[in-house]
Amino acid sequence: MPLSYQHFRKLLLLDDEAGPLEDELPRLADEGLNRRVAEDLNLGNLNVSIPWTHKVGNFTGLYSSTVPVFNPEWQTPSFPHIHLQEDIINRCQQYVGPLTVNEKRRLKLIMPARFYPNLTKYLPLDKGIKPYYPEHAVNHYFKTRHYLHTLWKAGILYKRETTRSASFCGSPYSWEQELQHGRLVFQTSTRHGDESFCSQSSGILSRSPFGPCVRSQLKQSRLGLQPQQGSLAKGKSGQSGSIRARVHPTTLQSFGVEPSGSGHIDNGASSTSSCLLQSAVRKTAYSHLSTFKRQSSSGHAVELHNLPPNSARSQSERPIFPCWWLQFRNSKPCSDYCLSHIVNLLEDWGPCTEHGEHHIRIPRTPARVTGGVFLVDKNPHNTAESRLVVDFSQFSRGNYRVSWPKFAVPNLQSLTNLLSSNLSWLSLDVSAAFYHIPLHPAAMPHLLVGSSGLSRYVARLSSNSRIFNHQHGTLQNLHDSCSRNLYVSLLLLYKTFGRKLHLYSHPIILGFRKIPMGVGLSPFLLAQFTSAICSVVRRAFPHCLAFSYMDDVVLGAKSVQHLESLFTAVTNFLLSLGIHLNPNKTKRWGYSLNFMGYVIGCYGSLPQSHIIQKIKECFRKLPVNRPIDWKVCQRIVGLLGFAAPFTQCGYPALLPLYACIQSKQAFIFSPTYKAFLCQQYMNLYPVARQRPGLCQVFADATPTGWGLVMGHQRMRGTFVAPLPIHTAELLAACFARSRSGANILGTDNSVVLARKYTSFPWLLGCAANWILRGTSFVYVPSALNPADDPSRGRLGLYRPLLHLPFRPTTGRTSLYAVSPSVPSHLPDRVHFASPLHVAWKPP
């Protein structure tokens, strides 16, 4: 007869009328019983012949094709001009005094951030914008291009101008080497004023491996300046700039852009204005160097007198193609839907390309992309605005994947210990948090996005015309792309974008200037950044709590008035660092803080209501006695696992589901198991904060017996059959809790200490979780454990009781500078250390 739910509850000792714990609990560790219950609940039956169910409510398989919906009305969000101050460390120090080592290290990490992949795969430009919405291809193309353009205008992207130069908008940082009229302009690290140098575009910035005497001669040539020799001095009349003594070699070396192989910047300015010497003079300039070979960072030996001449390079770089868009103006319309009708709507279509306010030199960047982009809804609640998804998954896959750094994510207990209090809370919204953190230009060649231009994009979609590079723009295939669909789409888009259609129809390659969201490095850097900032804020305002996880920053203070003044001060401080806050999205929570999916109040933490709703919905739609695909089970476990700490039996209750996912088998919910889970999740108990205290109850066990010490009372008992040591220790802890009612227990077993009950027999894990809920454990070394003797059957020997203080931990939750505790209303009594305690040291 199948096990009824009532009987199952009784078995797990969840009801009060169970017999004495010492008899009942060890039975749950019995393998035979666990197996019989599993069979009764149909948990072990993994080989099913009925077809699997692949959808439960909203949950589909993990790699489900949930088709994103294209919205033709999408607005591109606006981005403020975000410029994080470069001297952020100094500004923080002015505000709060010297920073701790931790804070400094974290802030240096992001100023600028660097990215070193092992290998970068370059994809053709056609793959730049993903054909994610085949029905709305053209519309999606222009919306995505507009989004990229917006990011470039906001200073978040670089635009690749040539192989070795890029332009951007916004304020430059000192590590971005400016080119003006083809010259390098060096900003010194102190930023007193710009030093402008005349560059001879040698493009080699590797560390020079010579002795000091040659090195001083070379210093200028390494930066592309002429070595000062008699023969040259005559040749360089009227050249601007000279090296002043103020530029230290360290600042010159710190532009860590190290191109592999020789090359130079093709600077797009005419060669007269870039004050290049004649090649004859250049040969003399380098003749004294030709004996050396200089090693560049990638290990190629570079001969310095071998530089390609400027003119030949620029011709090979820029094929002279007429503009595809403007060509339609002079051609005869091929039909009613010819693009020439649209092109003739305007006299002035504006320039073919736009250039940024600043030009900088970059490492060699090919005309390729390294990741595709597409648009989706900004979030489930905001479908009016779009969000750009960048797929840089190549860096986290395959043999050359980058192993991203790990960082601490606060767990539930740490979070509750830290934030569960009677403070008033508000949360700040950092707008476009990722785009605050600047990336070094050396990362640009690895993080490229872009598009191949409208003509290629359309041709690729309508696959009847293959465009090869050499036919590009010839008249016979100019009209191949004309079609009714394209005509109608462009006519509608003309209303939105006007003459920008021309600009957006050109190919473009953009690299990231701020960290992109699609790379595993970014969340790590963001977490380091916000936690360091919060650490500074906590020290600046001792009686408040500031805490952050990623871009979610919360502030807590004793009273609402205190909180408001704190809010003003912190906002001004963050703005002075260049951090952009979104004032409309500041939320005031009162005494119960909503953070990371939890509601945290003085009683402890609970899941937010929308998660509880989702769980109810999930149980409503959960089919009984039907095999459910294990990928759907993954989704269900993800949802239930989040709320598991708030239930009686916790994670152990989900163990059968975990087992089926691990074996990649379908799972069948029996009515009893479903009713059990349902009941578990209908009554949620808050996770309370742990309080400091003294440990006075100790438990210990051997495979055959257990022992407890409660104050001066001692107890011992034996097991019917020998048990594995971890199981015995867990039973001893349960007995100690139920006998003494104490919520701080001393144990010498690391598995019990970790409160992970998922490795024990299933029924025992579930029961123990409920008995030990809210218990804190203190580690006692076996040699000092007072319960060691009773567990071995010796009640006569007394070990002195230890005074073991328990201090709740906040884990590694980014509290680098611990904020002083909020003062209670009564001042503590002053404690004078006795001179004996201080002065006397044991021999």
UniProtKB/Swiss-Prot annotation:
Which reaction equation describes what this protein catalyses? Answer: DNA(n) + a 2'-deoxyribonucleoside 5'-triphosphate = DNA(n+1) + diphosphate; Endonucleolytic cleavage to 5'-phosphomonoester
UniProt site positions, description: Priming of reverse-transcription by covalently linking the first nucleotide of the (-)DNA: 63
In residue numbers, the region (Spacer) covers 178-346
Q: Using the record's annotation, list all stretches that form the Reverse transcriptase domain.
A: 357-600
Q: How is its activity regulated?
A: Activated by host HSP70 and HSP40 in vitro to be able to bind the epsilon loop of the pgRNA. Because deletion of the RNase H region renders the protein partly chaperone-independent, the chaperones may be needed indirectly to relieve occlusion of the RNA-binding site by this domain. Inhibited by several reverse-transcriptase inhibitors: Lamivudine, Adefovir and Entecavir.
Q: Which GO terms describe its molecular function?
A: DNA binding; DNA-directed DNA polymerase activity; metal ion binding; RNA-directed DNA polymerase activity; RNA-DNA hybrid ribonuclease activity
Q: Which domain of life is it from?
A: Viruses
- Per the UniProt record, which residue ranges are transmembrane? none
The EC designation for this entry is 2.7.7.7, 2.7.7.49, 3.1.26.4
Any Gene Ontology biological process: symbiont-mediated suppression of host innate immune response
Region: Polymerase/reverse transcriptase domain (RT); residue ranges are 347-690
Disulfide pattern: none
Keywords annotated in UniProt: DNA replication, DNA-binding, DNA-directed DNA polymerase, Endonuclease, Host-virus interaction, Hydrolase, Inhibition of host innate immune response by virus, Inhibition of host RLR pathway by virus, Magnesium, Metal-binding, Multifunctional enzyme, Nuclease, Nucleotidyltransferase, RNA-directed DNA polymerase, Transferase, Viral immunoevasion
Extract the PANTHER family matched here: POL PROTEIN, RIBONUCLEASE H
**Free-text domain note:** Terminal protein domain (TP) is hepadnavirus-specific. Spacer domain is highly variable and separates the TP and RT domains. Polymerase/reverse-transcriptase domain (RT) and ribonuclease H domain (RH) are similar to retrovirus reverse transcriptase/RNase H. The polymerase/reverse transcriptase (RT) and ribonuclease H (RH) domains are structured in five subdomains: finger, palm, thumb, connection and RNase H. Within the palm subdomain, the 'primer grip' region is thought to be involved in the positioning of the primer terminus for accommodating the incoming nucleotide. The RH domain stabilizes the association of RT with primer-template.
- Recite the other comments: Hepadnaviral virions contain probably just one P protein molecule per particle.
What is the name of the protein in this document? Protein P
Say which species the protein is native to. Hepatitis B virus genotype C subtype ayw (isolate China/Tibet127/2002) (HBV-C)
